[in-house]
Amino acid sequence: MLRNSLLTVTAAGALAAAPLAVSHLDDEQMMQSYRQSYLALLGLNFGPMVAMVKGEIPWDQERLEAFADDLDTLMDVDFLRGFPEGSQRGTTRAKPEIWDNKDDFADKYADLQKAVASLDEVAATGDRDAIAREVAATGDACKACHDEYKAKDYLY
């Protein structure tokens, strides 16, 4: 569990420092990398939790708690910073509607943050039914944003 937490903290730190490390890239590319890296980290932590709930991989309470903790830690990263004006162009799946509806997009992200906080809290109980409900609620929060703001294919 400690290794996974350290990995997430290290990755979050690298993500936060990414703008400095890639200052040679144009802003569009830098922000796209920022967003894609962040979302990849979310998926790497949430995906195994979904798989455990669905019975696709063995239930491992210790790992599940670590994934939930790390997912909650990632909610402290300023994801919305990755969407400045002008960064909607290029190779991305972020729909232009994000920039047209920034308040709604921010509200949906706040809903995700709340869902993840609740998931993290419930994960520690070991109650599989409650965990399954919170995983579903977190998935619904992800889907609410994806349905409206994520393109199926890359936009150019």
Language-model segments: residues:
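Bacterial N-terminal signal peptides that target proteins for export
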Residues: 1-10
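Sequence context surrounding c-type heme c attachment/ligation sites in exported
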Residues: 25, 29-61, 65-156
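N-terminal signal peptide c-region/cleavage motif recognized by signal peptidases
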Residues: 17-19
